[in-house]
UniProtKB/Swiss-Prot annotation:
Protein's recorded name: Proactivator polypeptide-like 1
Stored InterPro entries: SAP_A (IPR003119), SapB_1 (IPR007856), SapB_2 (IPR008138), Saposin (IPR008373), Saposin-like (IPR011001), Saposin_chordata (IPR021165), SaposinB_dom (IPR008139), Sphingo_Act-Surfact_Prot (IPR051428)
Residues of the Saposin B-type domain: 60-144, 183-261, 291-371, 393-474
Upper taxonomic lineage: Eukaryota, Metazoa, Chordata, Craniata, Vertebrata
An annotated GO BP: sphingolipid metabolic process
Gene assigned in the entry: Psapl1
Organism of this sequence: Mus musculus (Mouse)
Amino acid sequence: MLCALILWSGLLGAARASPISVPRECAKGSEVWCQDLQAAAKCRAVRHCQSAVWNKPTVKSLPCSVCQDVAAAAGNGVNPGATESDILTSVMKTCEWLPSQESSAKCKWMVNNHSAAVLSMLSGAQETDLASVCTALTLCEPLQRHLAETTSERPLTQEDANEVMAPFLSNGALSFHPSQMPEGAVCHDCVQLISLLQDALESNLTLAEVTVQNQCQSMGPGLAALCENYIHRQFVPAKQTLQGLPPQEVCRKGGFCERESAHWLTRVAAVDGVPSLEMEMPRTNELQMQLGLTCDVCLNLVQELDKWLVTNSTEALISHTLERVCTVVPEPLVQQCITLVDTYSPELVQLMSKVTPEKVCETIKLCGSKRRARSISRAVATTPSLPVDEENQGSFCQGCKRLLGMSSQNLDHKSTKRDILNAFKGGCRILPLPYVMQCNRFVAEYEPVLIESLKFMMNPTDLCKKMGACHGPKTPLLGTDQCVMGPSFWCKSPEAAEMCNALEHCQRLVWKKPVSKINEQP
């Protein structure tokens, strides 16, 4: 009996001495309990926080959106074969989206040590129950808490909620047209920003580089390395641009500031039919346009051909070279070069390996004294010409069709199909984890349909016509052929009469001389 009393008193003392112990800070209420899942579990308030705090609206962020997608997929049974371990692994991977390593490690620790609570919240029937796990793991921040920190404890209003959750809707309906900025405001902001960057580079280059690189850490583990590599490649030319040019010039090159017109370009407008008093000075390229641009194009074209035809001057090589030469001329002259090749290629083939560039351009009437460019309607060829496909003309037509034809045939190769399949599966990797398996399964099942669709779309003839490489015969524009000037040009000289097929007309009606005397003229 004495032993029983001693045992009873000992148990009673132990029970009175050790109640359900909780940390002292838990007495501060839900502000402390619901900071995260660890604090709620320590204060034994997980259910309270889940129903009263964590299910409330949250601030929009990338980690929060990814976590909510994963939680919704786990709770709705998108992958019915997933085990509890698979679900916890998916949730733990979302912790890697947090910006700092410390917060990411704490999130993973909470998932690992409070897995039962995480699975319990994911098994909830309500959508708010599923999303509450993201707030518990600090992947989502409660909207009320965010506003309390940024507005000095000011109570939440509907205007504040609109500003945080959907700032683009707070001032009216969504518009895809940006609001009009005051004139010069963008230029002023650009100049101010470039000036600050130049000051930072001059004062401390290492600090500026480190500051820029630190921004990559907020992009998540998958993109941080790519971001840093990009910055390393772009930082040196950006630094040279910033240090070598004044802020105004940098912003003008970027299109943020309008280019100032020089005072000598100012001209007085004509009034009542009186011509302008000051003539505008044209730019260099405009002077070339007025002083025989077509002749310059021809000379550049033939000189480039000479460089490529030193060892071999066959007609096949010349024709092939004509298709490539327009890629090396200056950008403003590319279109004129293409037109030149289409129109004058037969004459160039005949003359290329025999005469100098100046003689070539002079012979086909592109260079010379007061001669304008003309379009020759017939080729001066001594050999019979091959039949021409009326619908597939153009210097790049055959090359375009050969290229696309080979590409279409390569679609049947196993290696090409494997590369296409890997490319499509690579696109699946950017999706949230629950959808990756479904995307890969879709690509594998529909691979034959995708390949056949690509082959159907890559019809060489149709694609080359759409790109303009193949086209029908082009009619010379009125005014580009000197022969349309009539007898005043035909009968100017025997060469002009022969060129315009009007030798007999000039002899009979204008010159009224025998053919023998005409041929004797110099």
